[in-house]
A protein has these predicted regions:
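Core segments of cupin and vicinal oxygen chelate
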Residues: 35-39, 45-98
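Short beta-strand/turn micro-motifs at beta-sheet edges
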Residues: 30-33, 102-107
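Short, charged/polar, Gly/Pro-enriched secondary-structure boundary elements
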Residues: 90-95, 104, 159-163
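Vicinal oxygen chelate
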Residues: 1-35, 40-49, 84, 105-198
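Acetyl-CoA-dependent GNAT
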Residues: 97-101, 168
Length: 198
């Protein structure tokens, strides 16, 4: 995918520039030896059963750019397919491989591992545009929530990896967790109201 669709996606997603403070929260427990406060999640790399299936979902429906796609690549003591995806030209925000998972089933409930990956959008309207494409493609939405700090739409990718598509409210609108006046952090989000912003 290229051209207008790729340009549109680059404007849809943003990856937080951590040059400044990220919000009003004080840590519940401050580490004795704190990590670099500028650290951020650079990318998430997931196992997939089928590169073509995951490519169709993340590129054709979600709108990510393909940075690298290769077959029969050596890795982790075996060979498999790889796919690196980006929004805006970064080396990759999402990576996928079949090194030890080709043809495998989704991870079952009741085991440890990744809970979900959150993708933050730059505006409510841009979140709504992507959710509209998912709805149009028949992708089931698992949960729609207003968490006070952000709006969230939860769904699963073709391998059963859970995704959260989110839009953060401005910091000054965030509730303070634990305060008497803080709203519920898992209030329902109306799909029609969200899609009206598209």
């Amino acid at each position: 995918m290229g051209g207008r669709a790729a340009t549109a996606l680059r404007s849809l997603l943003f990856w937080v520039d951590v040059a400044g403070p990220q919000g009003p929260f004080e840590p519940a427990f401050a580490a004795e030896h704190p990590i670099d406060p500028q650290v951020r999640v650079g990318h998430v790399h997931l196992r997939t059963a089928d590169i073509d299936r995951v490519r169709a979902f993340y590129v054709d429906i979600m709108g990510f750019d393909v940075i690298l796609e290769a077959r029969d690549v050596p890795g982790w003591g075996t060979t498999g397919d790889i796919l690196f995806l980006s929004a805006g030209g970064y080396h990759h925000h999402l990576g996928f491989n079949t090194w030890k998972s080709a043809g495998g089933p989704p991870q079952p409930d009741g085991v440890t591992g990744l809970h979900h990956v959150a993708l933050n959008f730059s505006s409510r309207a841009r979140l709504a545009q992507t959710v509209q494409r998912l709805v149009d493609a028949g992708v089931p939405l698992r949960q729609l929530s207003d968490h006070g700090t952000h709006l969230a739409v939860y769904l699963s990718d073709p391998d059963g990896n859970d995704l959260e598509l989110a839009w953060d409210r401005p910091f000054e609108e965030w509730p303070v967790y634990g305060s008497a006046g803080a709203p519920a952090i898992d209030a329902p989000l109306d799909l029609d109201d969200l899609l009206a912003a598209a």
